[in-house]
Regions:
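Residue-level hotspots at or immediately adjacent to binding/recognition sites across diverse folds
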Residues: 1-262
Length: 262
């Protein structure tokens, strides 16, 4: 099972992906869902107008790990491969960026007119106005894994080492922050006036929340804690796991209490 949509975050239905690839990231923009994959042969992206029926598209065969939408275009970054970033104005036809040369891309987000990509090697950050021309930025060194934007703040979290968090109001100047635990932070999102992050391992609770992107508080999720991704929509936070038994989805309205899903 590689795709499952839900109209409410509680009831899920298995759907067929466009290809049997390892789909690592999905985003939505301009009426289209777009997903990217590090595997496959010539078909490492797919798109859907409804989240149910998916169609392959054909970007370069890099190890695509993250995609986002902003400024009228989709932009993706790769962990490895000849092409490190690509962009598309329609989510179907992709153009390579020759400007970004950094390897080990992990995540990309968009906010305040800027795409921000983070890298696990050397703790690098790179920014772009259009997904094509990129500029490297100086930041605290970290094993950066995930990024989000909300309420005038970029937030980036790390999977190991210190610092485990950093923030920036403009994507250019970054400040190290303290996470709630030395956890392997996998995903962060913004919604309901707060940032919410999840992790798959760690020394403390595997969920944390921040109301300003700088100060973090622990929250307790449900059991079977191998949380890999979290997102927000329609008033609900939804986190998903890659375990094959137990709690694979958990939901929360305000992050104070989580409920088990699938």
């Amino acid at each position: 099972n590689r795709v499952m949509p839900s109209p409410d975050g509680f009831t899920w239905t298995v759907r067929v992906a466009a290809a049997a690839n390892q789909w690592l990231s999905v985003t939505f923009g301009n009426g289209l869902f777009v997903a990217v994959s590090p595997t496959g042969f010539g078909n490492r992206a797919m798109y859907s107008t409804d989240g149910i029926t998916w169609v392959s598209s054909y970007p370069p065969d890099s190890y695509w790990v993250s995609v986002t939408y902003g400024a009228g275009r989709f932009v993706a970054v790769a962990l490895s491969g000849t092409v490190k970033a690509m962009y598309s104005t329609d989510g179907i036809t992709w153009s390579s960026s020759a400007s970004l040369t950094l390897s080990n891309g992990r995540a990309i987000t968009y906010g305040n007119g800027l795409f921000v990509a983070v890298f696990s090697s050397g703790g690098m950050v790179s920014t772009s106005n259009d997904g094509n021309i990129w500029t490297s930025r100086t930041s605290p060194v970290g094993d950066w894994q995930t990024a989000a934007y909300g309420d005038g703040m970029f937030v980036v979290l790390s999977a190991s080492g210190l610092p485990r968090a950093m923030s920036s109001p403009d994507g250019v100047t970054w400040t190290a922050r303290t996470a709630t635990g030395d956890n392997n932070w996998q995903s962060v999102t913004f919604g309901y006036d707060r940032f919410v992050a999840v992790s798959n391992t760690g020394s403390g609770p595997l969920v944390m929340v921040s109301y300003n992107g700088m100060d973090w508080q622990s929250r307790v999720g449900v059991s079977d804690p191998v949380w890999l991704a979290v997102t927000y929509g329609a008033g609900l936070f939804v986190a998903v796991s890659d375990i094959f038994a137990g709690n694979q989805v958990m939901t929360s309205y305000a992050v104070t209490v989580w409920a088990s899903g699938v």
